[in-house]
Structure formats: structure tokens, C-alpha cells
Amino acid sequence: MKFYNIFVFVALILAITIGQSEAGWLKKIGKKIERVGQHTRDATIQGLGVAQQAANVAATARG
């Protein structure tokens, strides 16, 4: 029973400490992930444009 009380107390102290700390490192990781997503989106849009142009050229060549 004492172990449970000590565990709850330590967990509470850790939660308070972590909650008040700045989430700078987490924010940096989030921004990097967001940037990768944006680059992937932009590359996909550009690739679709090139594929559409190639399809138009192929359709024009067939007559």
C-alpha cells in the first residue's frame, strides 16, 4: 500500500514538472514532420501535372 502511495506521489510530481516545461523539442519535431508532409504534397501535385501533360501529348499523337 505504501508503494502505491509513493508511486502516485512521484507520478504526480513528474506530471507537474513535465507539464510546466517548454515543449520546444516536441515543437521542432512537429515542424520537421509538417515540412516533410508539405514537400510530399507538393511533389505529388507536380508529378500529377507532369503525368497529365504526358497523357495529353500521347492523346494528341494518337490523333
From Swiss-Prot:
Keywords: Amidation, Antibiotic, Antimicrobial, Immunity, Innate immunity, Secreted, Signal. The keyword Signal applies. Residues 1-23 form the signal peptide. GO terms for biological process: antibacterial humoral response; defense response to Gram-negative bacterium; defense response to Gram-positive bacterium; innate immune response. It comes from the Eukaryota. One of its GO terms (cellular component) is extracellular region. Pfam families: Cecropin. The modification Arginine amide is found at residue 62. Its main location: secreted. InterPro entries: Cecropin (IPR000875), Cecropin_insect (IPR020400). It is found in: Secreted. Cecropins have lytic and antibacterial activity against several Gram-positive and Gram-negative bacteria. Belongs to the cecropin family. This is Cecropin-A1. It comes from Drosophila mauritiana (Fruit fly).
